[in-house]
């Protein structure tokens, strides 16, 4: 082993049984102990020594390098001497390195000891903070403690001293001691409660006695029920004979309690109007009463609900999760759900025809809808052009102007539809019914257009103010459509029905004949060139019905299209004409055609006939036939053509032409029987 390795080894310390060093070890530690030397030496001086030693080493190395470069015999001794000096400096550097490591170890040990002390102090601090927090909680609990007597509402001090006996109040003691005063007040409260308990027992006994008397009277009244039922059954024929069905009305009123507010308002107001003004209006309630009662039942016991919900959760976890489409369909069905009960109005007409209106309430949309069913008194003949007249989806369209029943009147429904992906209520009208605005009014509902309101209260006054007018409009609409149906059946066969009351409006002989009558679409009407003026005036709408007619006499053909408003006959039909004879003539190029149109469109009041004016359309068509005769018979005859006139004059006219426009005399004067200008 080399001498350097011996120097690097730490001195061996032998300890005796008591853990103390031996004398030999103490002598070695006294001679050489670098750990002790570290405490004595100054680190700055060691650092300076380190720098000086490094400089000396650099110097010696450069000198040795110079000597080697020179070469020579004398320089070898000098190089060896300098090597020895360099080794001494290396030994010094090694010692300084060991001293630096010892200092580092001592600094780490001191830092570790200081850290342990800090951790110990920090742990003590945490324990003390926990104790402080625990004590604060205990103090808070003590401060928040409330005795039971604080929850008892005691009588006031003045009332206590005025009512309590002296044996309990003890004013000589309690007036100065608040604790004794509270105890005395509690004693007085106990005494009062004992007295009230006695009174309570007496009241319970009295209650039991009264309940027994009530049970006896109930049994007596129940024994009368079979007799009353037999009396009611015996009075049913009398009620039917007098048209006073009290029993049925009573059942209806019992069922009406389960109606939603809008249907209830409709039922009450319609029943009141029927009893007061219109005996031919029958109001009934239909639907499942049990389901309606279930809607108002209070929820069952919470425990049962919890057990049911747990069972449902277990089942749903086992089932497969429904897809998004199925969830949306379920939400739509729930959104469009109707109330189990509905109100039916049956309007009877004089001729025996009935109009059945069934009103439904959509609970989540908060709107009313109606479905229509028509029962004619007589079997109607089939007429192709009358196909949509009695269509349940169209017969009530535009009962009030602009109310086609294709959109929801509640603005809040738009936001509800957006959430579940419903684009329009029109797709579900065939199933739910039409939500006309007048239907909402009959139910007392009013929806402001400026702001959506999810909850609207049914108003009895609103329903009552519109009930009579709406019923009259409904009955008039049914009668007008039935009358039009019969008229269309005759028109399709080329016959124009004119009643006896209206015979005086036309001459005895009308030669022109109706040869064609059929229905056309709105698009077909728009495509005709001679309907442009009517379209520009806004007199033709999609909700109207359109018909084509052809009147012929000889080679002349009068083509006409009719705009039939749903409000016929309050709103008259509008005619547009085109004559095919010696060219095509219309109101745009022939003033007489324009005058013919005005005779039926402007002076329609002359053709209404007896009220309510259901013969207006057929009278207008008959007048067109008469006007075509006048037009053709007053036309100039070409003398260059030989042979008889195609249209010989048979009408008496005071003057054939008038004015620069050369208009013809189209006004018929009864009873003189001649034609003149207006």
Swiss-Prot record:
Record bears the keyword Oxidoreductase: no
Annotated region described as Disordered, given as residue ranges: 1-37, 294-329
Compositional bias annotation for Acidic residues: 301-314
Ranges of biased composition (kind: Basic and acidic residues): 14-37
Motif extent (Nuclear localization signal): 7-10
Major site of localization recorded for this protein: nucleus
Ribosomal protein among keywords: no
InterPro entries noted in UniProt: THO_Thoc5
Localization: Nucleus; Nucleus speckle; Cytoplasm
A GO BP annotation: mRNA transport
GO CC annotation, single: nuclear speck
Keywords: Cytoplasm, Differentiation, mRNA processing, mRNA splicing, mRNA transport, Nucleus, RNA-binding, Transport
Family, similarity comment: Belongs to the THOC5 family.
Function: Component of the THO subcomplex of the TREX complex which is thought to couple mRNA transcription, processing and nuclear export, and which specifically associates with spliced mRNA and not with unspliced pre-mRNA. Plays a key structural role in the oligomerization of the THO-ddx39b complex.
PANTHER family, per the entry: FMS INTERACTING PROTEIN (PTHR13375), THO COMPLEX SUBUNIT 5 HOMOLOG (PTHR13375:SF3)
Name listed for the protein in its UniProt record: THO complex subunit 5 homolog
Annotated organism of origin: Xenopus tropicalis
Lineage: Eukaryota, Metazoa, Chordata, Craniata, Vertebrata
């Amino acid at each position: 082993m080399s001498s350097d390795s011996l120097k690097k080894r730490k001195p061996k310390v032998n300890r005796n049984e008591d853990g103390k060093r031996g004398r030999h070890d103490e002598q070695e530690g006294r001679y050489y102990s670098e750990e002790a030397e570290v405490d004595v030496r100054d680190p700055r001086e060691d650092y300076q020594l380190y720098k000086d030693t490094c400089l000396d080493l650099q110097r010696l190395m450069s000198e040795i390098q110079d000597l080697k470069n020179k070469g020579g015999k004398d320089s070898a001794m000098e190089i060896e001497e300098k090597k020895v000096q360099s080794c001494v400096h290396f030994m010094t550097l090694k010692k300084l390195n060991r001293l630096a490591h010892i200092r580092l170890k001592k600094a780490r040990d001191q830092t570790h000891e200081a850290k342990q002390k800090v951790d110990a102090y920090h742990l003590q601090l945490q324990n003390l903070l926990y104790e402080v927090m625990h004590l604060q909680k205990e103090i808070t609990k003590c401060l928040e403690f409330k005795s039971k007597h604080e929850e008892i509402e005691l009588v006031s001090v003045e009332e206590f001293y005025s009512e309590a006996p002296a044996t309990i109040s003890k004013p000589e003691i309690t007036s100065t001691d608040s604790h004794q005063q509270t105890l005395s007040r509690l004693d007085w409260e106990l005494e009062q409660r004992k007295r009230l308990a006695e009174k309570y027992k007496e009241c319970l006994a009295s209650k039991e006695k009264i309940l027994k008397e009530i049970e006896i009277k109930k049994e007596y009244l129940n024994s009368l029920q079979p007799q009353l039922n037999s009396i009611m059954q015996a009075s049913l024929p009398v009620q039917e004979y007098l048209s006073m069905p009290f029993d049925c009305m009573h059942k209806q009123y019992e069922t009406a309690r389960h109606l939603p507010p809008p249907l209830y308002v409709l039922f009450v107001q319609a029943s009141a109007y029927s009893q007061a003004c219109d005996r031919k209006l029958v109001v009934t309630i239909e639907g499942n009463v049990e389901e309606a009662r279930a809607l108002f039942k209070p929820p069952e016991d919470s425990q049962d609900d919890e057990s049911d919900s747990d069972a449902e959760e277990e089942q749903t976890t086992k089932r497969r999760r429904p897809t998004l489409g199925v969830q949306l369909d379920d939400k739509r069905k729930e959104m469009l759900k109707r109330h189990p009960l509905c109100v039916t109005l049956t309007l009877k007409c004089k001729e025996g025809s009935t109009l059945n209106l069934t009103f439904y309430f959509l609970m989540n949309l908060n709107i009313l809808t109606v479905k229509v069913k028509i029962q004619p008194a007589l079997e109607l003949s089939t007429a192709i052009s009358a196909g949509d007249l009695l269509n349940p989806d169209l017969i009530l369209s535009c009962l009030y102007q602009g109310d086609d029943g294709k959109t929801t009147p509640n603005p809040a429904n738009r936001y509800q539809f957006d959430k579940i992906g419903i684009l329009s209520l029109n797709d579900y009208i065939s199933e739910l019914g039409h939500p006309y605005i007048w239907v909402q009014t009959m139910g007392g509902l009013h929806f402001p257009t400026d702001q959506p309101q999810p909850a609207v209260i049914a108003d009895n006054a609103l329903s009552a103010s519109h009930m009579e007018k709406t019923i009259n409009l409904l009955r008039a609409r049914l009668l007008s459509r039935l009358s039009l149906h019969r008229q269309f059946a005759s028109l399709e066969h080329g016959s124009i029905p004119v009643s006896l009351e209206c015979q005086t409006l036309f001459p005895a002989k009308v030669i022109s004949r109706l040869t064609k009558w059929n229905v056309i679409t709105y698009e077909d009407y728009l495509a005709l060139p001679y309907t442009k003026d009517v379209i520009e005036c806004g007199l033709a709408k999609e909700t109207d019905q359109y018909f084509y007619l052809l009147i012929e006499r000889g080679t002349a053909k009068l083509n006409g299209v009719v705009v039939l408003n749903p409000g016929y006959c309050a709103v008259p039909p509008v005619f547009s004409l085109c004559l095919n004879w010696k060219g095509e003539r219309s109101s745009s190029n022939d003033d007489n055609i324009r005058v013919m149109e005005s005779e039926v469109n402007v002076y329609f009041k002359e053709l209404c006939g007896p009220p309510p004016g259901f013969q207006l359309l057929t009278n207008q068509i008959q007048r067109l036939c008469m006007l075509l005769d006048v037009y053709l018979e007053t036309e100039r005859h070409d003398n260059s053509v030989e042979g008889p006139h195609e249209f010989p004059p048979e009408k008496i006219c005071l003057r054939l032409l008038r004015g620069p426009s050369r208009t013809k005399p189209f006004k018929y004067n009864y009873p003189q029987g001649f034609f003149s200008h207006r």
